[in-house]
C-alpha cells in the first residue's frame, strides 16, 4: 500500500446555495432551497444549512421539502453563474497543483505531493486553499487530507462546514473503524440494508469479516469494502478523467420473475442516474439495460434516443421498453442494471435543476 501521496479532497459547502446567499443579502441566514417551484414536480439540487436544519437535503422532492420547511425560499438557480464560480475555484487550485481531478462543480481531488509552492505539509496547503477561496470568493470549503482518495473524501465530510480533517497513514484504520458503513463509497440503500441485516453498522464491524465472506454476501462490493476499511484504495488523482457513462445496478437477494419488481428497480435507478447526471452537468442519448439470469447468462440491450436527456422519466421509459422487448418471464433475473451512455455537457440554458 503506497502511503507516500498527499491528496486533498475539497468539497464546497452547500455550493449553489452559498453562491446565492453571497450574491443576495436577502437570502442570508434564511432557509434557501435550489430546485424550483415546490408546487411542481422537481427535486432539490441543494439547500442552505438553514434549510438542512429542517431535514431538507439534495435529491428530495421539492414538495416534500416544502412540507418540512414551509418558510423555505425556493429558487431555480443560475447554473451558468455556478459554472463561472466553479472555474474561479479551479483557478485557485491550479496555483498549487496541475494534478486536479474534478468530480463535479463543487468538489475535486488534488494531488499536492509535489506542489507548485514547495509546501511540505498537505494540511497547510489545504488550509491555505480554504482561506484563499474565502478571501477571494466569499465562500467556504471543507477539506479532507490523506494518502488516498477514498479516505480524503470521507474526511472532507467529517467537519462540515469549513472544516479540515487530516488522516495520516498510521491513523487510517482507526479512523475508518469509527465511520458508519453508509459513508463508504459504493454503499447505497440496497447494500446498506444488506449490511444492516448482517449486523455491520461501522467500519469496525466490517473489519471483523473475512474477504471471502464479504464477497460471498456482497459480491464485488464485498471485495471493495474489504479493501476500503483497511485503507487500501486508489490513490491516483486523474486530471484527465471524463465520465463516459452513468449507471446503477443491483444483484437481488432472491432471483426475480415479477416484471413489476424489475420495473420498480429501473425507476429507482433512473432517479439515481438523473441525480448524478445533473451533478455532472451532463446528459446522454443512449440507454442501456443489463440483465443477468439465474444461470449467470448476461444480456445487454440499448436504445438511442432522438435527443439528449437527463430526465428520469424519459430514461425510465426507454429502459422499460427495452425490458418489455427483452424479458418475457422465461427465466428468473439475478441482476438488473441501467446505464446512460453517449454523454455530453449540458448547455447552461437547458440544464435541469428540476427532476421528476
UniProtKB/Swiss-Prot annotation:
The keyword Cytoplasm applies. Binds 2 magnesium ions per subunit. One of its GO terms (cellular component) is cytosol. InterPro entries: DNA/RNA_pol_sf, DNA_pol_Y-fam_lit_finger_sf, DNA_pol_Y-fam_little_finger, DNA_polymerase-Y, DNApol_IV, PolY_HhH_motif, Rev_trsase/Diguanyl_cyclase, UmuC. Pfam families: IMS, IMS_C, IMS_HHH. Its EC number is 2.7.7.7. One of its GO terms (biological process) is SOS response. Its cofactor is Mg(2+). SUPFAM superfamilies: DNA/RNA polymerases (SSF56672), Lesion bypass DNA polymerase (Y-family), little finger domain (SSF100879). GO terms for molecular function: damaged DNA binding; DNA-directed DNA polymerase activity; magnesium ion binding. Residues 1-188 form the UmuC domain. It is found in: Cytoplasm. The record marks 16 as: Substrate discrimination. Keywords: Cytoplasm, DNA damage, DNA repair, DNA replication, DNA-binding, DNA-directed DNA polymerase, Magnesium, Metal-binding, Mutator protein, Nucleotidyltransferase, Transferase. The active site is at 107. Poorly processive, error-prone DNA polymerase involved in untargeted mutagenesis. Copies undamaged DNA at stalled replication forks, which arise in vivo from mismatched or misaligned primer ends. These misaligned primers can be extended by PolIV. Exhibits no 3'-5' exonuclease (proofreading) activity. May be involved in translesional synthesis, in conjunction with the beta clamp from PolIII. Monomer. This is DNA polymerase IV.
